[in-house]
A protein has these predicted regions:
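Class II aminoacyl-tRNA synthetase catalytic cores and aaRS-like
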Residues: 1-588
Length: 588
């Protein structure tokens, strides 16, 4: 019996001319030239090959096959008379002696053209994802994902990390987002939860005596979709290190990530260590965001003094920030369009004025600005555009302005590179929007800077707890947050005191986090970790704006898998076995 194929559809070259070969793949296209001549494009995972049918019998045979049927072709390779330099196999063609149908496409028309599937409606693409993935332009992102994960795994092992899998069925835990719950059939009224992250397990591994842990970890959070966040399920390069600090984590990430970004990315330039470190409050003040895109050279300046007692009441006596953009050639229409985009994103209206070629202020709110006073705060060279944001959302708006106008203004963004930075010194506590009381700002298990002493001072009223910073850090690349990490609070006494400041006592901690609290009472090492998002990394490397483009089978924005029909109703028998009564149904 002959093997299923002798070559794939992407490997035949001129040196194979004269060889007898067998190819298999999808019949992508058929172009009939006459009664006994047709050109067939045969496609498999590796590429395409032109098949030249030169007999009326074989032509009649393939005319009975719909496009996207799978076939095998046995024939002889020959050099093309008219070569195609844009195709790897463009120097050759195969003249078939035998064609066999392997899998018939039963439909005369497709939901979309395979090679143009990215232009199709997203709902159609997700419904027929198995067709969408036949498009090489779509498939390449999944191949990239595989290669990046393999490289990450190899790099982590070279740094002496052990790959250890942690449970998928675990206990529900108050970690910020909503849990996906799994009813326990043998324990009526009780539920497992899918892990939002392996956070507690990886810290427990450190208390168990393991030194360096990692895994490509699946995480499950019932949260809404965004461009850089897929609903339901995502993956992260989860890591933790015992007897380690922030510096140890930084060293590993700075050693592992730049080579992978430079090798697999759309751009081949990535930050070299050490990455720039920016304090959280400084990032907000300078860039208007804790996720700055350092490829953009624009920064914010506080110009509140310019509008003290101003007749422009919208900005009068408020916090006002400005961004000066030199050598800006945008038209008024373009400026207004971009400001409208900023308003939609930030929920606040922005303003502008410009320095004309003569050096005079013009346009927008220029009449409300004193040039002499402004020139002491801002570089007002001719052709400088000044963007202005004021009020409670001034910081947020100015951050959006920088990320929106930076790419639009020539010379202010070095786009073709990956620029990493660390955001450090996050606040430990904040005032809750709903409660109006002190709450943890981010991870409650981060070690407070200053340890127990600073918590005791806050308890005694000697310092404001809002001034306490945590040993917590974010890794940001090109304005995208890749990960949060922290030096962990491994001391039960410090942990209890940290929770007491938010009105939770020792019994609350024991009840919410029993395993971790008990483990720490048996002597825990100082430890630290981080978990860069794999999906976000691949999205950046692929140059995609939507995270769904780099996931093999993504959900839509409403957390629905419309290809598989999930979520779906289940039978009453299944519900009875799980002791569940459905009290509400989704309206059709």
């Amino acid at each position: 019996m002959m093997q299923s194929r002798t070559h794939n559809c992407g490997e035949l070259r001129a040196q194979h001319a004269g060889e007898h070969v067998k190819l298999v793949g999808w019949m992508e296209n058929v172009r009939e030239v006459g009664g006994s001549l047709a050109f067939v494009v045969l496609r498999d995972f590796y590429g395409t090959t032109q098949i030249v049918v030169e007999t009326s019998e074989l032509l009649a045979q393939i005319k009975g096959y719909n496009k996207e049927s799978t076939i095998s072709v046995e024939g002889t390779v020959r050099e093309r008379a008219s070569k195609n330099p844009n195709q790897p196999t463009g120097d050759i063609e195969v003249v078939p002696e035998k064609i066999e149908l392997l899998g018939r496409c039963r439909y005369n028309s497709l939901p979309f053209e395979i090679n143009r599937s990215r232009e199709a409606d997203e709902t159609q693409r997700l419904k027929y994802r198995y067709l969408d993935l036949r498009n090489p332009a779509v498939k390449k992102n999944i191949i990239l994902r595989c290669n990046v994960i393999a490289a990450l795994r190899k790099a982590m092992m070279e740094h002496d990390f052990l790959e250890i899998t942690t449970p998928i069925l675990t206990a529900s835990s108050p970690e910020g987002a909503r849990d996906y719950l799994v009813p326990a059939r043998k324990h009526p009224g009780k539920f497992y939860a899918l892990p939002q992250a392996p956070q507690q397990f990886k810290q427990l591994l450190m208390t168990s005596g393991f030194d360096r842990y990692f895994q490509i970890a699946p995480c499950f959070r019932d949260e809404d979709a965004r461009g850089d966040r897929s609903p339901g399920e995502f993956y992260q390069l989860d890591m933790e290190m015992a007897f380690a600090s922030q510096e140890d984590v930084f060293a590993v990430c700075e050693d592992v990530l730049p080579p992978i970004f430079a090798k697999f990315g759309t751009y081949d330039i990535a930050s070299q260590p050490p990455f720039r470190r920016i304090k959280y409050l400084d990032a907000l003040e300078i860039y208007g965001s804790d996720k700055p895109d350092l490829r953009i050279d624009l920064t914010a300046t506080n110009v509140s003094s310019l509008f003290e007692g101003s007749s422009f009441e919208v900005l009068a006596d408020k916090t006002v920030k400005a961004v000066a953009i030199s050598n800006c050639s945008l038209t008024r229409k373009q400026i207004d369009k971009l400001l409208t985009d900023c308003e939609v994103q930030a929920g606040a209206k922005g303003y502008w004025f410009k320095v004309d070629e003569k050096g005079d202020l013009a346009g927008g709110i220029a009449k409300f600005v004193d040039k002499e006073a402004a020139s002491k705060l801002l570089p007002l060279e001719p052709n400088t555009l000044v963007l202005v944001a004021g009020g409670e959302l001034a910081t947020k708006l100015v951050g959006v302005m920088i990320k929106t106008f930076g790419p639009a203004c020539e010379g202010h963004m070095d786009k073709e590179r990956y620029e990493f930075c660390w955001i450090v010194d996050f606040p430990m506590y904040e005032i809750g929007d709903e409660s109006g009381e002190l709450e943890f700002c981010h991870n409650p298990f981060s070690m407070p800077a200053g340890g127990l002493d600073v918590l005791l001072k806050a308890e005694r009223g000697e310092i404001d707890p809002l001034t306490i910073t945590a040993d917590q850090y974010d890794l940001v690349c090109n304005g995208v947050e890749l990960s949060s990490g922290a030096g962990r609070n491994h001391d039960p006494e410090i942990m209890i005191k940290a929770f007491e400041l938010v009105r939770l006592g020792e019994e609350d901690v024991k009840a919410k986090f029993p395993a971790m609290y008990n483990a720490f009472c048996y002597g825990a090492p100082p430890h630290a970790g981080i978990a860069p998002g794999v999906d976000r990394m691949v999205m950046l490397l692929a140059g995609e704006d939507s995270i769904r483009e780099i996931i093999p089978f993504p959900m839509n924005k409403n957390a629905q898998d419309i290809m598989m029909g999930a979520p779906s109703e289940v039978t009453q028998k299944q519900l009875d076995e799980l002791h569940i009564a459905v009290t509400a149904h989704e309206e059709e």
